């Protein structure tokens, strides 16, 4: 259970607090449509800003509710981490709060490999890093794999095994995943 009440003061500037449609379930069709729209937006940004590297942040939130207090806290923390890690290298940062989840798009002059290294560092060292999905998108619109910078697979939130394996095999219940996310968010909020 989250132990804070003053969400606006906790989050400060940035994504803001849009409480409309919070905890609303989305359908698989809506989720798939949002992925297509995100890819189209990425391609548009790459076309408009040729020569820059695109970094895209989304929040890992299992289940049919993508916008909740936990994902809002994680998104805000992720955007703050991007701002800090890419300080002085950021050309533009766009944040989007959609019914299907939070997204941030950062354009940088860094090479795709250097941007991917920084993205992996955030995912691996931030308290909430496992809740961040930070992709570096190449000129063809494909995300660079972690292996390109010598990083291993993402780890599972619950057992620390390979996340892809646990997800594919439904190794953990939604309740287990949500309990772990709540615990991570609670610990993070207590520290800030």
Cite the ranges covered by each PLM segment.
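Aromatic-anchored, charged helix-turn/loop surface patch used as a conserved interaction hotspot
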Residues: 91-92, 98-109
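N-terminal, intrinsically disordered charge-dense segments
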Residues: 1-2
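Short beta-strand-to-loop capping motifs
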Residues: 59-61, 106-113
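Glycine-biased, low-complexity coil/linker segments
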Residues: 12-14
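Carboxylate-dense, calcium-coordinating segments in secreted/extracellular and ER-lumen proteins
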Residues: 17-19
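Long, contiguous binding/interaction regions
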Residues: 22-89, 97-99, 117, 123-192
